Amino acid sequence: MMLSEQAQKWFPTHVQVTVLQAKDLKPKGKSGTNDTYTIIQLGKEKYSTSVAEKTLEPVWKEEASFELPGLLIQGSPEKYILFLIVMHRSLVGLDKFLGQVAINLNDIFEDKQRRKTEWFRLESKQGKRIKNRGEIKVNIQFMRNNMTASMFDLSMKDKTRSPFAKLKDKMKGRKNDGTFSDTSSAIIPSTHMPDANSEFSSGEIQMKSKPKKPFLLGPQRLSSAHSMSDLSGSHMSSEKLKAGTIGQTHLLGHQLDSFGTVPESGSLKSPHRRTLSFDTSKMNQPDSIVDEGELCFGRQNDPFTNVTASLPQKFATLPRKKNPFEESSETWDSSMNLFSKPIEIRKENKREKREKVSLFERVTGKKDSRRSDKLNNGGSDSPCDLKSPNAFSENRQDYFDYESTNPFTAKFRASNIMPSSSFHMSPTSNEDLRKIPDSNPFDATAGYRSLTYEEVLQELVKHKELLRRKDTHIRELEDYIDNLLVRVMEETPSILRVPYEPSRKAGKFSNS
């Protein structure tokens, strides 16, 4: 037989036997009836149906599936005989024999019948007298399991291997393992070292690749796409990244280190810390540059030069870019009316003392360390310290200077102090401050509030494209299912029969 002709042949791998019913059985019971069951056997496998009690025409409709040990082809010398043995169950003693039938599966397959339902006559045992024992109705169907057919080919490939071939494979496997271990270090992410002229540390450069995260999304959501460098530098805050991108000096980076642990340690139970550090980072970028410029170029005439050194974090959001003397007359008068004459006298004295000490601070550099200490302890200071300063205490000296020289102090006291969860303070009316929505980290829209209009449009277009692709994929799956159902209906399986009666499985005998 040619290989092409053999490939076009259909060879079954399984046979499914369904015992439907029996009739005209010999009575063996006491009441003239039988408690009948049938044993189904092919080779060494045996199955048994349930017991149909007290009847001479039992109905079972139970099936059993057998795997053919070899290929069932035409002209095969190997014969496959299916045995059906009908028995009567006895409560006392051995079960009684009612009849048997032997079915040659080769003959059924050679007749090119994949399915056959037929009544078979029950016969006696060999050597016994032949008599009428009734009939049994059986359905025989040949099936092919592609998984079983492919397993034969795999087993044949494994048998052809010799011990020398296995030894050779082991040597190749060691060599492959060695090359894999040598190249496994390639998955470690590399970190680019900065140049000698660079003003930023390696930690800041690694943080540049970290994506922006909204400050209201919850505590530290790290995705699996982060590299090892991002995970190792996760303790660094976003304030240092923003300071590095603007181009500030090393001094500003050291000052902002005190705020680094605030957003990382913030949890859902205390969202105020996280919001505070985020807003102060947005504030400190332009203002710190102005303060450093004043220290370097020696602007002595401005009475508000050293105000930023004594500011706590809650007052740091006040605008200091504009000169307060250039404000409108109404705002200035309303703020100055709240100051008493002794305070004005002390303000002039402190201004003269500050001008005298400014040169000493520039030479010795003590102001820098003093400012860094204030920034480190600024988050824990409360606004109550500003309201009750002690003029005779050196630790409260800068606080008193700020209260006596800042014209916005009276205006800040007049307004309602907002909760620490929202520090976007600006010279606006109280109605605008009340309109600010409370930030809720559990809000689904909180992550989109920080996005611009263009970014929202990009997200919308991206989601529309994803929906379009999903609709196309769903349509393809529906077409595939329709075609598959048509092919199944053409085969007319038993599940599509009208009326459908689900078949029961016959019990299998144990080998013991």
Curated annotation (Swiss-Prot):
Q: Which Gene3D superfamilies match?
A: 1.20.5.2440, C2 domain
Q: How is it modified after translation?
A: Phosphorylation at Ser-227 by MARK2 regulates epithelial cell polarity.
User: Which residue numbers does the motif NPF 1 cover?
Assistant: 323-325
Gene Ontology BP annotations? establishment of cell polarity; insulin secretion involved in cellular response to glucose stimulus; phagocytosis; positive regulation of GTPase activity; positive regulation of protein localization to plasma membrane; regulated exocytosis; TRAM-dependent toll-like receptor 4 signaling pathway
**Membrane topology (UniProt):** Peripheral membrane protein
Q: Where is this motif: NPF 2?
A: 406-408
Q: Which SMART domains match?
A: C2 (SM00239)
The record's SUPFAM superfamilies line, in alphabetical order, gives: C2 domain (Calcium/lipid-binding domain, CaLB) (SSF49562), Eferin C-derminal domain-like (SSF144270)
- GO terms, molecular function: identical protein binding; protein homodimerization activity; protein kinase binding; small GTPase binding
Chain intervals for the UniProt region annotation (Necessary for interaction with AP2A1, RAB11A, subcellular location, endocytosis activity and homooligomerization)? 465-512
| Compositionally skewed regions (Basic and acidic residues) per UniProt | 361-374
Q: What is its main location?
A: other
| Domain C2: from-to ranges | 1-120
Region Necessary for its cellular translocation to the plasma membrane, as annotated, extends over 15-102
Q: What is the effect of changing residue 481 to E?
A: Abolishes the interaction with RAB11A and the vesicular localization
Quote the subunit structure annotation: Homooligomerizes in a Rab11-independent manner. Forms a heterooligomeric complex with RAB11FIP4. Interacts with AP2A1, MYO5B, RAB25 and REPS1. Interacts with RAB11A and RAB11B (activated GTP-bound form). Interacts with NPC1L1. Interacts (via NPF motifs) with EHD1 and EHD3. Interacts with TICAM2; this interaction directs RAB11FIP2 to the phagosome. Interacts with RAB14 and RAB25 (GTP-bound forms).
- This protein is called Rab11 family-interacting protein 2
What organism, scientifically named, is this protein from?
A: Homo sapiens
Upper lineage: Eukaryota, Metazoa, Chordata, Craniata, Vertebrata
